[in-house]
Amino acid sequence: MRSHYCTDLSKADIGKEVILCGWANTYRDHGGVVFIDLRDVSGLIQLVCDPADSKEAHDVAAKVRDEYVLKAKGKVRARGEGLTNPKLKTGEIEVIVSELIIENPSEPLPFMIGDESVNEDIRLKYRFLDLRSERLQNIFKMRSRAAIAARNSLDKMGFIEFETPVLTRATPEGARDYLVPSRVYPGQFYALPQSPQLFKQLLMCSGFDKYFQIAKCFRDEDLRADRQPEFTQIDIEMSFVEQEDIINMAETMLKDIFKACGHDIKTPFRRMSYKEATETYGSDKPDLRYDLKMIDVIDIFERSSNEIFSSIAKDKKKNRIKALKVPNGDNIFSKREMNRFEEFVRKFGAQGLGYFQMKEDGLKGPLCKFFEQSDLDEIVSRCELKVGDVVFFGAGKKKIVLDYMGRFRIFLAEQMGIIDQDRLEFLWVLDFPMFEQNDDGSYSAMHHPFTMPKNIDEPDLEDILSIAHDVVLNGFELGGGSIRIHKNDIQQKVFKLLGIDEAEQREKFGFLLDALTFGAPPHGGIAIGFDRLNMLVNKASSIRDVIAFPKTQRAQCPLTKAPSYASNEQLRELGLRIREKEQKA
């Protein structure tokens, strides 16, 4: 239908007759001459419909409105002096139209294309219109480049691409499964995979050495700005490798992906233990674009005359007292603002938030009366305080303190505007605990139960570490993986520590345990969140921006109105009956 894309044309094409197709981006009538900015997937070009050149084309142009689909035939010419548009790639040329066809009109638009002030639910309802915006068009072109770069990079390193089943069985991987009822086997269900974890391990047992796929995964979990019920990951597994091999491979691939997206990143990435990350930054995915760090001061507070502080400080294993220094904070935040910060941390379980201000004559603040001068001097020394600095303190249970002080660190950085939005700061977090304790006292695997432990014979479960690795970018977990358990006895021992008895092991994981007894090789891998990667590359505020047809935060699709009710006939075929939700008394 067309001879060129809009932005294929340049001054070198002046005088050529061309045929273009696209949408009417804008329409203007200047003194009887109609100007139309024609838009296609490549960009914009200006069409000129002058009755002096073609009355027929001009008559058609008079009927054109926003988003009409057009086919235009005409000659390329240079724009007149002073009429060029440096903002457009084709800003030095235009097309004098000799023939114009309206291929399809458009109803009046529910919103202007590219207007991001429109409610997101409305934009998602008309996602096919929203996707016409230049910003989203560029995002999905970038996403395609990233996928191609990932495939090319892994292909160069000898990986084989596979497709693993989407209809599988439920396995405990940390979130709720999406279940699919079987018509053939009434009362039985498939589960949509939370990841291809077990299948990729089985492929290593099959001798394929290097596996990858760009996999669709499903998790029925509460949604946030960076989560969706269905998502895509670059899934990778390798045989006969150690952790260092996986890290080197992942850095090579990420370097290739980011280069394809216009970013040169430096390797190797910085590395940090889980303990250092949580104790220093209050997070296992710290944002290192700014240098606010937490400092341990529990031993100093143990000597405090304040009984609350001193009692907290006595149990150094279960409790924490952390200082967070803000350079020049006394000149940035008013006393009223600093008092208001307490409201922020209380939302995350804090009992309070103390602070000192570093003045010319030493530390000042309501907490000073509880300390000897020598202890105040030690706080100044340990926190390396200078005049004008403020240091905040959080005290209480370890898990709660590290969490709210980590959140407070991010909050302060945002308030001070010290986050460099153009900086890409990668980090490997290593030496994760193998297990984490739940609120009911039971234990679950921090990553998943197929991760190889470093020291399985430690008597205290909380002291067992895993050979796991997360790659972090700007405070987001970009991906994670581990060396896997390849020996049946170790896998069974991990299951037992998690409270999974032999009968349940056989029922849920019998196929894996069997595979491990037939010469399973040492293996490991990683999965990179492809949606999240694209969110960060494109500086998008939500993962929904980088998914063509995303769900809302309520896990609904305004476009297709999914989820929807099944018909009675469908339910009968599946042997299902919907029970009314019981009302609470």
Swiss-Prot record:
NCBIfam families the record matches: aspS_bact, PRK00476.1
Assembly description: Homodimer.
Reactions listed under catalytic activity: tRNA(Asx) + L-aspartate + ATP = L-aspartyl-tRNA(Asx) + AMP + diphosphate
Organism superkingdom: Bacteria
UniProt binding sites for ATP: R219, D220, E221, Q228, E477, G529, F530, D531, R532
Site (Important for tRNA non-discrimination): H30, G82
Compartments, record wording: Cytoplasm
Major location category of this protein: cytoplasm
Pfam families documented for this protein: GAD (PF02938), tRNA-synt_2 (PF00152), tRNA_anti-codon (PF01336)
InterPro entries assigned to the protein according to its UniProt record, in alphabetical order: Aa-tRNA-synt_II, aa-tRNA-synth_II, aa-tRNA-synth_II/BPL/LPL, Asp-tRNA-ligase_1, Asp-tRNA-ligase_1_N, Asp/Asn-tRNA-synth_IIb, AspRS_core, GAD-like_sf
GO CC annotations on file: cytoplasm
Biological processes, Gene Ontology terms: aspartyl-tRNA aminoacylation
Native species: Campylobacter concisus (strain 13826)
Region of interest called Aspartate, as start-end residue ranges on this chain: 197-200
SUPFAM superfamilies: Class II aaRS and biotin synthetases, GAD domain-like, Nucleic acid-binding proteins
Protein name: Aspartate--tRNA(Asp/Asn) ligase
Chain residues that bind L-aspartate: E173, R219, H447, R484
UniProt KW keywords: Aminoacyl-tRNA synthetase, ATP-binding, Cytoplasm, Ligase, Nucleotide-binding, Protein biosynthesis
Family of the protein in this entry: Belongs to the class-II aminoacyl-tRNA synthetase family. Type 1 subfamily.
Keyword Signal: no
GO molecular function (one): nucleic acid binding
Gene expressing this chain: aspS
Functional note: Aspartyl-tRNA synthetase with relaxed tRNA specificity since it is able to aspartylate not only its cognate tRNA(Asp) but also tRNA(Asn). Reaction proceeds in two steps: L-aspartate is first activated by ATP to form Asp-AMP and then transferred to the acceptor end of tRNA(Asp/Asn).
EC number of this enzyme: 6.1.1.23
